[in-house]
C-alpha cells in the first residue's frame, strides 16, 4: 500500500462550533494525496461525531494537552510529510499543492516553513516565510521527526518541540501565505497568553532556561 504524501494532524477539544471550517479547508484542497488524522481530546460535545464525517482516522483521548494529542497522531501517521492544523484555523485554497510543489523542488530539506495570514482584534496581518516557533506553518519530513515527540507541557509545547528539531534541520522557505491563524479567538490559549493571563511561573523551567539560546540560534539563522 502506497504511503500518502501528507499526514494532516488536527488535535481538537470541544470544537463543534468552528472545527468544520478547519476540516473543510482540508477537504476542499485540490491536492488529495493525504490522510487526515483527527484527535478528539477530552471532548464532551459533538466534536467526535463531526470528526467521523471527515475521516476514518479519529482518535479519542483524554490528555488535555495539544502536544500529547499530536504525539498520538504521529504514532499512527504514515505520510511522508506531516502537516499540523489547529482546530480553529484553516488552510488557504491550493495550499497542499503549493507545498507539495515546493517540496519537489527542495528534496533535501527537512522542514518547509511557509507564510500565514492571521487575525488580531479584527485586523488581518501577514507573516511570510519565517521560521516562527509554531508547528502549523510548516511541513515536517516524517523520517526527520523519527521518534521525537512533543513534551508533556500544558503550554508552549510548540517551543519544546521546535527547540529539539529546528537547530538540526535543513530548512526551506515558501514566501507565500498558505495558512490562516485565528490568533485571538476568545477563550483560546493564545488569546490568554496575548492578554497576559499567564505568568512565567506557569511555564516549565526548561522553557525559561533555554529561550535565550533558542532566540540566539534564530538570529544566526537569519
Feature map (PLM): residue ranges:
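A conserved acidic beta->alpha catalytic loop
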Residues: 25, 32, 40-49, 86
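Catalytic core of nucleotide-sugar-dependent glycosyltransferases
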Residues: 180-184, 191-221
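Acidic helix N-cap motif at the loop->helix transition within catalytic regions
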Residues: 17-20, 45-53, 90, 94
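Short aromatic/hydrophobic "clamp" motif used to bind/position activated sugar donors
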Residues: 82
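N-proximal low-complexity "stem/linker" segments adjacent to membrane-targeting elements
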Residues: 1-25
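Conserved donor NDP-sugar-binding/catalytic core segment of glycosyltransferases
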Residues: 90, 94-124
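Conserved nucleotide-sugar donor-binding catalytic segment
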Residues: 123-196
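Glycine-rich, basic loop-to-helix element that forms the pyrophosphate-binding segment
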Residues: 61-77
Amino acid at each position: 500500500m502506497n504511503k500518502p504524501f501528507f499526514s494532516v494532524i488536527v488535535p481538537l477539544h470541544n470544537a463543534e462550533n468552528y472545527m468544520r471550517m478547519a476540516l473543510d479547508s482540508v477537504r476542499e484542497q485540490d491536492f488529495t494525496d493525504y490522510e487526515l488524522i483527527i484527535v478528539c481530546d477530552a471532548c464532551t460535545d459533538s466534536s467526535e461525531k463531526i470528526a467521523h464525517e471527515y475521516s476514518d482516522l479519529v482518535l479519542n483521548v483524554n490528555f488535555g494537552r495539544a502536544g500529547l494529542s499530536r504525539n498520538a497522531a504521529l504514532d499512527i501517521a504514515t505520510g511522508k510529510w506531516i502537516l499540523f492544523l489547529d482546530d480553529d484555523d484553516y488552510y488557504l485554497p491550493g495550499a497542499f499543492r503549493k507545498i507539495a510543489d515546493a517540496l519537489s523542488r527542495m528534496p533535501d530539506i527537512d522542514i518547509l516553513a511557509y507564510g500565514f495570514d492571521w487575525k488580531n482584534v479584527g485586523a488581518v496581518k501577514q507573516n511570510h516565510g519565517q521560521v516562527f516557533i509554531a508547528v502549523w506553518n510548516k511541513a515536517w519530513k516524517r523520517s526527520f521527526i523519527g521518534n521525537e515527540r512533543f513534551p508533556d507541557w500544558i503550554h508552549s509545547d510548540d517551543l519544546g518541540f521546535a527547540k529539539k528539531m529546528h537547530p538540526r534541520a535543513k530548512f526551506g522557505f515558501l514566501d507565500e501565505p498558505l495558512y490562516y491563524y485565528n490568533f485571538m479567538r476568545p477563550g483560546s490559549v493564545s488569546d490568554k497568553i496575548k492578554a497576559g493571563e499567564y505568568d512565567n511561573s506557569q511555564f516549565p523551567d526548561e522553557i525559561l532556561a533555554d529561550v535565550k539560546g533558542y532566540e540566539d540560534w534564530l538570529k544566526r539563522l537569519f
